[in-house]
Design a protein with these regions (language model features):
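Hydrophobic beta-strand anchors of alpha/beta hydrolase catalytic cores
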Residues: 66-67, 99, 160
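Short active-site neighborhood of thiol/selenol oxidoreductases, capturing the structured segment around
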Residues: 57-85
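Short loop/turn microsegments at loop-to-beta-strand junctions
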Residues: 42-43, 64, 157-159
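Structural microenvironment flanking redox-active thiols in thiol-disulfide oxidoreductases
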Residues: 80-132
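Thiol-/selenol-based redox modules, centered on thioredoxin-like
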Residues: 149-194
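N-terminal targeting signals for export/organelle localization
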Residues: 1-44
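Short hydrophobic alpha-helix segments
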Residues: 58, 135, 171-173
Length: 194
């Protein structure tokens, strides 16, 4: 009897997994926006750093750069991605590359997060989501209801871009279903391949 129940549960789990994979494949997730395709120049945009100083995307020329567009510290998947990247930060830095996180979080929150991770990530702020709109990375109603008073309704669709020293996009990863992020080792390999 117990064997039959265990077999039935295993079959049910297998069916659920197969159905989920089929649905995921059919949905296909989101595709990379036209302005972020590899081989194109990184579009011009303006952001603020954690000190409130205005920065331009053209400031990135001269060194390879990994840019992460993150939803916010309230997102467990973004927090895990940033925590995982701390393990590869030194390797990426040794290759002469920069690592920049662009976030819509308020400046005070960005400063707290910058101190929390205790690495030299650069945090760029896009609180109005102007960059997200320009690049096609807005996730409408992507902020959970519990956080909307502080962060608003919309946020970034998670993405990672590797740009070479000439400002050309070489690799773009767009999270397909909010929960997936590129393995930090893949970002490191992308920088190393430049």
């Amino acid at each position: 009897m117990q064997l039959a129940i265990a077999g039935g549960v295993a079959t049910a789990i297998a069916v659920i997994i197969i159905v989920a994979l089929v649905i995921r494949r059919k949905m296909g997730g989101r595709s990379v926006p036209p302005g972020l395709q590899p081989g194109q120049p990184l579009p011009a945009f303006t952001a603020l750093d954690e000190s409130g100083r205005e920065l331009q995307s053209s400031d990135l020329r001269g060194r390879p750069t990994v840019i992460l567009f993150v939803r916010g510290s309230w997102c467990p998947f973004c927090s895990k991605q940033v925590a995982d990247l701390t393990k590869h930060y030194q390797d990426i830095n040794k290759l002469g590359a920069r690592l920049i996180l662009i976030t819509p979080k308020p400046l005070q929150t960005t400063r707290r997060v910058a101190k929390l991770f205790a690495v030299e990530f650069e945090f760029w702020l896009d609180e109005s989501l102007a960059i997200a709109r320009q690049l096609g990375l807005v996730l409408p109603n992507g902020v959970p209801a519990d956080y909307r008073n502080e962060y608003g309704r919309d946020t970034y669709w998670p993405a990672s871009i590797v740009v070479d020293g000439d400002g050309i996009i070489r690799h773009t990863w767009l999270s397909k279903f909010i929960v997936d992020r590129p393995d930090p080792a893949k970002l490191f390999e992308a920088v190393r391949s430049l």
